[in-house]
Amino acid sequence: MYDAFAKVVSQADSRGAYISAAQIDALNAMVADGSKRLDAVNRITSNSSAIVANAARALFAEQPALIAPGGNAYTSRRMAACLRDMEIVLRYVTYAIYSGDASILEDRCLNGLRETYLALGTPGSSVAVGIGKMKDAAIAIANDPNGVTRGDCSALMSEIGSYFDKAAAAVA
């Protein structure tokens, strides 16, 4: 954000002109968008434990074989690993939301994840369902209009959904 402000000031200075109304409006829009991002990240982060726990609970209710003897989430150690992985995906999604860029999610979280799950015998389709459940919860929490920056958040919610979709597709 600082770079955008510095660029506008530098351009105006090189022309020997004041910053135009259009440039001020563009910077105001950028600040408002940044505030909405921060609100969304803060809400998702503040509710991350509930998002992960509720998504896992819903996943295991739909796919009880996962927690039955012989299932991929059977035993407390495997369950803990499943919850940890869901939390890691959610954390990297928040990084992508904050930056407005999926590359950190792709490079540091999703790159090679499908292959890891295949090697471990973890059903990627089940992981994708869990990610989808986190997506629904995170968007509902982030899109709550109470106590956040006002304005149309539909584009941001769509963007947030795309990060979860990217994660689900990477493991399916």
Swiss-Prot record:
Residue sites binding (2R,3E)-phycocyanobilin 2 per the record: C153
Membrane topology designation: Peripheral membrane protein
Transmembrane segments: none
CDD domains hit by this protein: PC_PEC_beta
Keyword Thylakoid: yes
Domain of life assignment: Bacteria
CC terms in the record's Gene Ontology section: phycobilisome; plasma membrane-derived thylakoid membrane
Keywords per UniProt: Antenna complex, Bile pigment, Chromophore, Electron transport, Membrane, Methylation, Photosynthesis, Phycobilisome, Thylakoid, Transport
An annotated GO BP: photosynthesis
Quaternary context: Heterodimer of an alpha and a beta subunit, which further assembles into trimers and the trimers into hexamers.
Function: Light-harvesting photosynthetic bile pigment-protein from the phycobiliprotein complex (phycobilisome, PBS). Phycocyanin is the major phycobiliprotein in the PBS rod.
Name the record gives this protein: C-phycocyanin-1 beta subunit
Native organism taxonomy: Bacteria, Bacillati, Cyanobacteriota, Cyanophyceae, Pseudanabaenales
Gene: cpcB1
